[in-house]
C-alpha cells in the first residue's frame, strides 16, 4: 500500500476495525449518517431508519457490490456525474485500508453503543420538546430530587444543556427518566398541539398520553440495560429481542 514514505508491504490481517461514528463510515467508504444512504452495513435510506419492516438482510451492503459501484463512480468523466452516483449509492472515495484484502462492511461493523445511545438521545429530545412550561419546571424539580449513584459525575440541567451531553450522560439520564416521569407527568405538563397530534396520528386519548410516554421510557431503559449487560446469555439475548420489538410499537 502507498504511504507518505513510499510503498509499503503489509503482512498480517485485520480482524475487526473499531471506529466511532462517523469515522467508521469513512473507513468503509460510505457517506456519513446524515446522507440519503448513511448506513455502512446496508442500503437503507434515511427516511426508513425507523421502519421496523425494512429488510436490512436482503438490502445489505456487500463488498463486491460496493467495489463495482466505486468503479462505476470513478469511470465517470464529469464530476457532476460522479457526485450524482456517489449520492445515489451513499459512497465516498475509498480510504487507505481499501488497498488491503478486507471486507469494509463486515470488518467495520455498526457498534451498539452509538446506535442505542443515539436512539436514547433522540427520545430525550422529543420528550423535552413536548413539555410546556409547567412540564419543564416540574421535571427539573424532580430531576434535582431524585437519588443518583454517588460515583456519577454531576450533570448540568438537561433541559438547557443536553446538546453538550456525552453519550455516557445520555445513558445515565435515560435510566432515570422512567422514575422521574412516573413521579409527576400528567397531560397538563404536555403541550396541547402534542396531545392533539398523538390523538390524530395514533388514536391515543389525551388523558392516556402521559402513561404511554412513561411506559415507552420504561421499555427504553430496560432495552439499554439488557444491551449493555456485562454478560450476555441466550436468555438475555431473547429478552432483548422481545424488548426491542415492544419498543418499536411505541
Regions found by a protein language model. Give the residues of each.
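Charged (Asp/Glu and Lys/Arg) segments that form or flank catalytic channels of large polymer-
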Residues: 1-179, 188
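Terminal interaction-prone segments of large eukaryotic proteins
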Residues: 133-250
Amino acid at each position: 500500500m502507498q504511504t507518505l514514505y513510499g510503498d509499503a508491504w503489509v503482512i498480517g490481517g485485520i480482524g475487526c476495525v473499531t471506529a466511532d461514528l462517523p469515522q467508521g463510515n469513512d473507513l468503509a467508504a460510505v457517506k456519513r449518517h446524515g446522507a440519503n444512504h448513511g448506513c455502512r452495513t446496508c442500503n437503507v435510506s434515511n427516511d426508513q431508519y425507523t421502519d421496523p419492516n425494512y429488510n436490512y438482510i436482503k438490502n445489505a451492503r456487500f463488498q463486491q457490490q460496493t467495489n463495482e459501484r466505486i468503479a462505476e463512480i470513478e469511470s465517470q468523466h464529469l464530476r457532476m456525474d460522479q457526485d450524482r452516483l456517489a449520492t445515489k449509492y451513499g459512497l465516498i472515495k475509498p480510504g487507505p485500508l481499501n488497498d488491503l484484502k478486507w471486507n469494509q462492511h463486515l470488518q467495520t461493523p455498526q457498534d451498539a453503543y452509538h446506535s442505542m445511545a443515539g436512539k436514547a438521545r433522540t427520545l430525550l429530545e422529543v420528550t423535552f420538546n413536548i413539555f410546556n412550561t409547567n412540564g419543564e419546571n416540574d421535571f427539573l424539580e424532580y430531576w434535582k430530587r431524585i437519588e443518583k449513584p454517588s460515583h456519577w459525575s454531576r450533570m448540568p440541567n438537561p433541559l438547557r444543556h443536553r446538546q453538550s451531553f456525552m453519550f455516557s450522560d445520555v445513558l445515565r439520564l435515560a435510566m432515570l427518566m422512567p422514575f422521574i416521569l412516573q413521579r409527576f407527568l400528567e397531560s397538563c405538563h404536555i403541550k396541547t398541539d402534542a396531545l392533539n397530534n398523538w390523538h390524530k396520528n395514533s388514536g391515543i386519548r389525551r388523558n392516556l398520553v402521559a402513561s404511554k410516554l412513561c411506559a415507552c421510557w420504561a421499555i427504553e431503559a430496560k432495552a439499554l440495560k439488557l444491551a449493555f449487560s456485562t454478560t450476555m446469555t441466550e436468555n438475555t439475548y431473547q429478552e432483548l429481542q422481545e424488548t426491542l420489538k415492544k419498543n418499536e410499537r411505541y
